[in-house]
Amino acid sequence: LKMNVDDRGSFTEIIRTGSAGQMSVNISKPGVTKGQHWHHTKNEKFVVVKGRGLIQLRKEGSEEILKFEVSSDKIQVVEMIPGYTHNIVNLSETDELVTLMWCNEVFDSNHPDTYFDPV
């Protein structure tokens, strides 16, 4: 598998399908925020399997921020719906945050449907 690594951690596509989207694993270094974008059509689901984090969502055009504290101590799914900018923050100062991510569409670099906007 190809790990896309930078100073924030890594992002690795695990499974790509034509009909069921894709699964990926995201590793965030301590204190790092990832995301800060929204999609027109992509629907994503995040599941933290190691560590402790904060997922934040904000509907485009709104100032209200929805916050979800997530951790491997209580496995749950948080959904990123189209039209909501979102991020995930690693709340630990020492441990990595590992998140499984499912998206209903595979990533297409010619049509990324990813628009930067801080939560």
Which stretches of residues belong to each language-model region?
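A short beta-loop-beta micro-motif enriched in histidine and acidic residues
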Residues: A20, V32-K45, S72-K74
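Double-stranded beta-helix
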Residues: S62-E64, T85, V89-V119
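Glycine- and acidic-residue-biased ligand/ion/polar-headgroup-sensing regions
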Residues: T41-E60
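Short beta-strand His + acidic residue motifs that chelate non-heme Fe in jelly-roll/DSBH
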Residues: F11, G35-H37, I55-L57, V78-M80, ...
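Short acidic-glycine-tyrosine-enriched beta hairpin
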Residues: K59-G83
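A short glycine-rich, His/Asp/Glu-containing loop-to-beta-strand
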Residues: N4-Q36
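Short, surface-exposed charged micro-motifs
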Residues: K45, K67, N87
